[in-house]
Amino acid sequence: MAKEQVQAITKMEEDFAQWYTDIVKKAELVDYSSVKGCMILRPYGYALWENMQKVMDEKLKATGHENVYMPMFIPESLLQKEKDHVEGFAPEVAWVTHGGDEKLAERLCVRPTSETLFCEHFSKIVQSYNDLPKLYNQWCSVVRWEKTTRPFLRTTEFLWQEGHTIHETAEESQAETLNILNLYASFCEDYLAIPVIKGQKTEKEKFAGAKATYTIESLMHDGKALQTGTSHNFGTNFSEAFDIKFLDRNGKWQYVHQTSWGVSTRMIGGLIMVHSDNNGLVMPPKVAPVQVVIVPIAQHKEGVLAKATELQGHIQKVARVKIDASNKTPGWKFNEYEMKGIPIRLEVGPKDIEKNQVVLVRRDTKEKEFISMDQLEERIPALLEEIHNSLFNKAKVFRDENTYSVTNFEEMKKLADEKQGFIKAMWCGELACEEKLKEEVASRCMPFEQEHLAEECVCCVNKWCIGEKRINALLDRKDEKDFGLHNKCNPKSFLVLQFVSCIFKMEG
């Protein structure tokens, strides 16, 4: 039975999408519901989310953020107040049109995100600069009517946190936006062992209604990218639309400066696709629901279960631990907990008790060692840290080995046909060049850590963006000085690009 269970996992090299689906099902993270695109988070999957939520919640509260809860329904008239925002979400909105048998006077949107609700509330409670800042966070579910779904990565309903803050100055809101992005990045790296690239989205890729959108991007096992979290600076775009004003220190009315940011259960999907293997899930230790499983060997023999229970008592001081005292065979248990990705397995039997030792097996490397029972409380925390570092370093090496630099469009196109991963290239910032790039690749971000890869933009070097169409667009600005500057390519940033075949990207 155990072998059949393991063999049922499709190899990632054969079909990555099916491999992923096999793992989330067989590791008992989720089950499918009767509603298309909605998943049931099983106890093991929800415990993982709870651990992630607990860490994030503590970090947000430590920086002065307060938890609130907004309604799940948004009146259509309220949603329409920010035009760009509405257009960005319109295809994904679910509408409530009836209450019982009665048709509603106004349609209600099932929240795809809660900006409009927070804005309405802020407009009622803010009068003076003394009322600022407001640093709010919400843990909830949202609904986006996706056509193509996959557990954790793209679902009709999903769990997330969304933060919404308002500030007195533009500088404060920008600092908040970047501080949260850094918080997300450190959470991914320090708890999920996922290396990320921090950067800014292009004007075309930014969140609907935002002044600027910042992102953390990760590379999965199959060489495709995942947007793991985003932080948005709204400037005064929403506060002007919703009339969120305050009396400043000089007695003048000003619009508040606003931010919005969020991460979701998509992080669990990223965790799976970065660390897991063809034997099942591999859990980063710091968020694993169970960090150590004890498997008694020949548990029917006198003293074995008692010793396992005694060891559990010691280990639970330093780690999350369970004993499997079921009647299943040790072999079945080994395969089961390998499938579920528990970082450390301890085996204890009569011979081990005689020697005052246990057999310790790492899930990530499958390395086995014999260790004295007296050393477990010291060894296990150190080993959990070793496993975390090993997973992070392995993922970082994979990302770096699958990141390429190009200097012209043809080189980029050839690379996109032959490889999977990230491409780094210079970009001048012009929309015409970005449109040309997107014919072959998907833009991910403009990384904060810049490199000077070439003297010209990857498209400008081929003269595609400085022809008649571009000149006309610049002439429409009626600014000859500006035209003169832009007619000569002056790349100031580079894009991390990811191949167009990516199926896991979901905005928001």
Curated annotation (Swiss-Prot):
PROSITE patterns: AA_TRNA_LIGASE_II. InterPro entries: aa-tRNA-synt_IIb, aa-tRNA-synth_II, aa-tRNA-synth_II/BPL/LPL, Anticodon-bd, Anticodon-bd_dom_sf, Pro-tRNA-ligase_IIa, Pro-tRNA-ligase_IIa_arc-type, Pro-tRNA_ligase_II_C. GO terms for molecular function: ATP binding; catalytic activity, acting on a protein; proline-tRNA ligase activity; transferase activity. It is found in: Cytoplasm. One of its GO terms (cellular component) is aminoacyl-tRNA synthetase multienzyme complex. It catalyses: tRNA(Pro) + L-proline + ATP = L-prolyl-tRNA(Pro) + AMP + diphosphate. Its main location: cytoplasm. It is an enzyme of class 6 (ligase). Its EC number is 6.1.1.15. Belongs to the class-II aminoacyl-tRNA synthetase family. ProS type 3 subfamily. HAMAP family: Pro_tRNA_synth_type3. This is Proline--tRNA ligase 2. It comes from Bacillus anthracis.
